[in-house]
Every structure is written in C-alpha cells, then in structure tokens.
Amino acid sequence: MDFDKQLFFNVEKIVELTEQLEKDLNKPNLSFEQIKVINKELKHKQPLIVKFKELQKLVENANEAEQILNNSSLKELHEEAKKELEKIKASLPSLEEEIKFLLLPVDENNQKNVIVEIRPAAGGDESCIFLSDLFNMYKNYCTSKNWTVELNEIIPASVGINFVSFAVNGTDVFAKLKFESGVHRVQRVPLTEAKGRVHTSTVTVAVLPQLEEVEITINPSDLRIDTYRASGAGGQHVNRTESAVRITHLPTGIVVACQEGKSQFSNRDKAMKMLRAKLWENAQNKQLSTQADLRKSQVGSGERAEKIRTYNYPQNRITDHRIKLTINKLNTVILGDLDEIIEALQADEKKQQLEKFIS
C-alpha cells in the first residue's frame, strides 16, 4: 500500500524520543522545573502519538489485507481483503493530513494571557464611538469563553472612548485574540450625521501576550516610576490617594500607565505586565525589521485603506480581508459572536503553516 513512508519514519522517531522522556520522569533528583518542562512536552506530543498509533494500525491492517490478496485462493477472503484495503486507502490521506498539522510548530505564546490596547485612528468622534463598540464586543466574547477581563486604563472622549487597555486571562487566549491585531474599519451613518451619509472610520487594536518575569528581564535601574492621583468616574479617588502608576522604560522610551486598580501596588503590578508585553512587541518588531518579508508594525498606520476587517452597518456585513471572508451577521458579531471569524482565521493559519512545512 502506498503511504508517506518519510512521514511515518519522522513521526516514529518523535514517538521514540517521547517514550524516552516518559522514562526520564522516573529519574531521581529531577527539579520541579525539569518535571514541569517534561510534562509540558509530553502533553504537547500526546495528540500526535494517538494519531500515529492510528496510522500504525492502518498500515498493519493494510499489510495483512495485501498478504491475503497475494496468497489466498479463497474468493470470500479475497473480496473481504479487497474491501478492507479500499477502506484503508480512503481514510489514509485525511489521517496523514492530521499528522502533518500536528507536526507544525506551535506558537509558544498561544497559551498565554494577553493585554489588549484599542486606539482611535481616522474618523474623529465616530472612531471613538466605534472604539467603545469594539471594547464591548471583546468583553462579551471573553465572557462567552469564561475568560476574565481586567481594566488597566481607560481614557474617555467627549463621545465614546479615546483609549482603553485591558488584560484578558483564561485558556488559549492569545491563540484566539492574536488575530484581532490590526486596523478595524467601520462604515455607517454616525449619530451626529444630519444628512444620513455613510462615514468611514478606523480604530487600531494591538494584542500582546502577557510574559512572565523570567521571560523578559527588566533592570530596575532602567525604570522611572511615577505615582499620581487616579481620576476615576464621578471623582473617585480624586485628590485622595496617589494610587495611579506610570512607568517609563528609559532605554526604549516606552511608557505604560495604570490607574484602574484599587491600590498603588495593584496598579504597579498591572503596569509591569503591560511593560513586559510592550518590550516583547518592541523585540519582535526589531526582529521583523531584519527579515526579508518586512511588514508593518502590528496595528499599521490606521489609514482607512489599511485594514484587516470592515464592519458595514448599512448592509449588516462584516468582511475579514485577510482571508476574504464575508458574513452577513454584523448585528451578532458586534455583540461578541466572533467564533466563526476566529475559527476561519485559525484554519487559514494552519493551512499556510502546512504549505511552508511541505515546501
């Protein structure tokens, strides 16, 4: 039977190495960190091992069927073996495809929590109003996933919101929300438009993985930390306590601020998480600048023509331009029903990875 023998050989080697890792767990004097790393690797490889065992079984059954076809003179056995072989040949390509997907490199940040920042771009007041709509959309989506949302900073505008930063904690958060980074364009009639004309506005979204202290080293001497009075809604904390925190990373000039926590300690902790995420983004951008396929930064310039997604209210249509996906249910998407779009983006990511893997 024809099957991808090189694929079989490669996975067989991986399975052997995984079995060795299982044996290593029984070694004495392993540190907690070593055990943690091994268990993480075993968990990651488990789906591949399951599929490989399925492939092994198919190959064994195919070999048995071929032996019967070549050696048996009994017509009944011959027909049964022929049917079995046809069944195996039909199921083999999809199984090999699944295994190839499982061999693809996994983004090490997929399991991480995130920090999301949304800013208005082109469109004035309408951009600030749309920013507020997107913020509510993400909050609803996070609720549907049983994720928690923690507000870091919010700056109100005369209408809508001028800036918002929030953390999202849960399972596989970056794996899903990372696709939201970029320019989001809205086409609709603003509430302030007397003549009923459709306006186009944009906001930028940045999704950054939250990194642990061990992943990003920050020298305390590189930081300037300022405290100030938080300006909560309705005058909360105003002129009462300097609980808000602003941190400046002197080597890069990156500034982060947090005032939504109840204490200076809480705000400082959140601000440090934001800073680690910003430094990661800064390092990523430097790395990208050295590559041949240099692309623009995560959110781009915010120009109307530079967009990842368009929200067309008059036609109840939402289009993701990266994968040319159009669905006519903007009314539910804007309330947080993002699954169809995000799942399509994840599938496209896997497809592109597989094409690179094969080539």
Swiss-Prot record:
It is found in: Cytoplasm. One of its GO terms (molecular function) is translation release factor activity, codon specific. Methylated by PrmC. Methylation increases the termination efficiency of RF1. SUPFAM superfamilies: Release factor. The keyword Magnesium does not apply. Its main location: cytoplasm. The modification N5-methylglutamine is found at Q236. Keywords: Cytoplasm, Methylation, Protein biosynthesis. The keyword Protein biosynthesis applies. Disulfide bonds: none annotated. Pfam families: PCRF (PF03462), RF-1 (PF00472). InterPro entries: PCRF (IPR005139), Pep_chain_release_fac_I (IPR000352), Pep_chain_release_fac_I_sf (IPR045853), Prokaryotic/Mito_RF (IPR050057), RF-1 (IPR004373). One of its GO terms (cellular component) is cytoplasm. HAMAP family: Rel_fac_1. Belongs to the prokaryotic/mitochondrial release factor family. Peptide chain release factor 1 directs the termination of translation in response to the peptide chain termination codons UAG and UAA. This is Peptide chain release factor 1. The gene is prfA.
